[in-house]
Amino acid sequence: MTVTRRATFMLLLLIAATLPAFGQVGRDWGVERRSYQDPVSGVRIDELATVGVNDNLYFHFSNFTADNRYLIFSSTRTGTPQFYRAEVSTGRIVQLTDSPGGTLRGICPDRTRADRVYLIRKDEVIALNILDFSERRVATIPPPFIGGFQQPTQSGDGQSLTITKQVDERTWEIGLLDVRRGEYRTVIRQGFRIGHVQHSPTDPLIFYVWETGGYAPQRTWVVNSDGSGNRPFYARTDPKSWFTPLKEWITHEAWVEKTGEMTMINDKQGVMLVDKAGVARMVIEGDYWHVAARPDGRFMVIDDNKGRLWLLETATGNRRLLATGLRDTVRAVHAHASFDREGHYVQFHTGRTQETIAIIDLRELPGLKWQ
């Protein structure tokens, strides 16, 4: 082989290494968006996908790209769960992955680059360009592990991803992956199941919970990103200070993007806002299910088990109804609602007529009806 031919061959290999690995990546599924007016609230709602079972990402971070142009979601329309982008302005859906069934573990839009998401496929962390569909392998998650991979989250500067894994039958680990160097380091190991791992968007802190599926002696924890200072986060150790005579169950926690506070559900008691020191205040009392805040923290979106969705004003606790009937057809649906990057939209999972994703443009709300 001549030097010129060899150089050409090596260049082709290099190009091939960055191209999407599977056949349906980049497929244009067209526009499936349909709109309706909620019969109770009068709010216009756009459902974005009609083919297959469609789901949003967990609400620990915005499901929108950094430029607010696309909403990232999953769908089973090809037979296995894959990731897609939906253009907010048009509703046009384009396929982002075509991985073998059961190999995708989670995805996280890059807050610093609008064209990039990070995903976990098998034990590899991939940087995927959602415009040209090229891929870069960031790193392979180092053993030992027996699974337990969860949705990655990004540090505020965009330089690191949290990685969660189950080391063995009794041990769980949180690690940090440097996305530029591909270097992984262990932050902490615990002898209990770890869940809801989230890097703070404002501070070098990682939040996590002792996951039991119910009450835990101490559910919420925070650790410095260098592994030091592991400590309980929100804690009320004196029963006299509990919001309820029953043991508290704190759940469905999420950082507030620009303030470094955290929203939490106090089960059957209400919605809490917790500061960086772990001190909480009750924003609104009631039996709510999930909560996420607008990036500036001024408003929250909350839902309940009856399939109703509200916009909540943080300062006053006033709320207004956005949507109803989210569990009318598919009872298993969890709304997992959250805001876009600018606070213009609310996105959520709905089972009103089928399992799909929907958005509400808050700038088009009818006259205020606060309660």
Spans of features found by a protein language model:
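Short loop/turn segments that connect beta-strands within beta-propeller blades
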Residues: 87-91, 129-133, 178-182, 224-228, ...
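Blade-terminus and WD-like Trp-Asp/Gly-His loop motifs, strongest in beta-propeller folds
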Residues: 61-70, 106-116, 120, 151-160, ...
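Blade/loop signatures of beta-propeller domains
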Residues: 24-46, 173
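Blade-level signature of beta-propeller repeat domains, shared across WD40, Kelch, NHL, RCC1
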Residues: 333-371
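Beta-strand C-termini and the immediately following turn/loop, strongest in propeller blades
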Residues: 19, 24, 72-78, 97, ...
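A short beta-strand motif characteristic of beta-propeller blades
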Residues: 46-52, 92-98, 134-144, 183-188, ...
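Conserved blade-ending motifs and adjacent loop-strand segments that build the rim/top face
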Residues: 239-240, 281-294, 317-341
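Asp-box/WD-like beta-propeller blade repeats and closely related beta-sheet repeat scaffolds
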Residues: 98-171, 182, 186-193
